[in-house]
Amino acid sequence: MIEKSFKYFENKNIDFSINLSFHDISNEYIIDYLLYKLEEYNLYNNLIIEILENESIIDFDLVRNFVEKMKSLGVRIAIDDFGSGYSNFNYILELEPNFIKIDGSIIKKIHNCEKSFKITKAIVLFAKELNIKIIAEFIHNQNVYDKIFELEFDGYQGYFFSEPIEDITNYNMG
């Protein structure tokens, strides 16, 4: 998937993300391959690595070293599915991400659930205090978008903007 992603975005000059789990990050082969492909395609400043929040990180030192290495190369880090797991704030303290992507399970109810709105607002406020950009997942209608817009998110994603595009795994490698 790394090769296909890099090949697909090689000449597009846009940011793109790949998801990595703790298991992926702890696999030396995967990390060496990622570093090799980063050098080959020179996409350091376009890549955002999304670390899956809903998976337990067993070795924070290993992940922190990985994050520091990636950031030193210009790669940005996001915590994906923020709000879906148990260690959210610890992840922020330990990994110092560039982005937090708030999980759709919180966002999808923001327009008709006051608790969801207040929780989201609190996450946005603390993220801004820490200079972390915040992205809303699962924006599926105008009402949800209006609430997210009110909170001044940095980025948005969901069916309201576009249905998923062609799966990159189907991309013709040429």
Label every PLM stretch briefly.
Residues 21-24, 50-58, 75-174:
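EAL-family c-di-GMP phosphodiesterase catalytic domain
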Residues 1-62, 138:
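Catalytic core of bacterial c-di-GMP phosphodiesterases, primarily the EAL and HD-GYP domains
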Residues 10-11, 40-44, 72, 94, ...:
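Alpha-helix termination/capping residues and helix-transition junctions
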Residues 7, 29-36, 62-72, 118-125, ...:
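Alpha-helical scaffolding segments of alpha/beta enzyme cores, especially the outer helices
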Residues 37-40, 68, 89-91:
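Short, flexible, glycine/charge-rich loop motifs used to bind or transfer phosphoryl groups or to couple energy/partner
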